[in-house]
Curated annotation (Swiss-Prot):
Keywords carried by this UniProt record: Lipoyl
Phylogenetic lineage: Bacteria, Bacillati, Bacillota, Bacilli, Bacillales
Gene: gcvH
A GO CC term assigned to this protein in UniProt: glycine cleavage complex
Name under which the protein is recorded: Glycine cleavage system H protein
GO biological process: glycine decarboxylation via glycine cleavage system
Its job: The glycine cleavage system catalyzes the degradation of glycine. The H protein shuttles the methylamine group of glycine from the P protein to the T protein. Is also involved in protein lipoylation via its role as an octanoyl/lipoyl carrier protein intermediate.
Stretches assigned to the Lipoyl-binding domain: 22-104
InterPro entries xrefs: 2-oxoA_DH_lipoyl-BS (IPR003016), Biotin_lipoyl (IPR000089), GCV_H (IPR002930), GCV_H/Fam206 (IPR033753), GCV_H_sub (IPR017453), Single_hybrid_motif (IPR011053)
Species annotation: Staphylococcus aureus (strain JH9)
PROSITE patterns xrefs: BIOTINYL_LIPOYL, LIPOYL
Length: 126
């Protein structure tokens, strides 16, 4: 199962890619495989504020609905609108086409609480 080294991970199975003061957030390959076929993705609006640990959307699969938890706090600067029409991208390409939101980071110290790829792999038993 892919766990890219350049990303950071939350214990709730979100990944974070940091570029400058913007973090791109999505769900991991492990999370999508546990959920099964994704049929709907609900995301926040651009300019919404999200707070670390709070829900910022949900992913609905044929099995269940799973909340998305913000791994960091910040202002949503971009939302992946393609997921509205193509939620299957979450299954097909969780780290590329299925990024969910881009957030302007409000507290960089929150990044320190995220897991490295190695620690995340250990957590999921890989």
């Amino acid at each position: 199962m892919a766990v890219p080294n350049e990303l950071k991970y939350s214990k709730e199975h979100e990944w974070v890619k940091v570029e400058g003061n913007v973090a791109t957030i999505g769900i991991t390959e492990y999370a999508q495989s546990e959920l099964g076929d994704i049929v709907f993705v609900e995301l926040p609006e651009t300019d919404d504020e999200i707070n670390e640990g709070d829900t910022f959307g949900s992913v609905e699969s044929v099995k269940t609905v799973s909340e998305l938890y913000a791994p960091i706090s910040g202002k949503v600067v971009e939302v992946n609108e393609e997921l509205e029409d193509s939620p299957e991208f979450v299954n097909e390409s969780p780290y590329e086409k299925a990024w969910m939101v881009k957030v302007e980071i409000s507290d960089e110290s929150q990044l320190e609480a995220l897991l490295t790829a190695e620690k995340y792999s250990e957590m999921i038993g890989e």
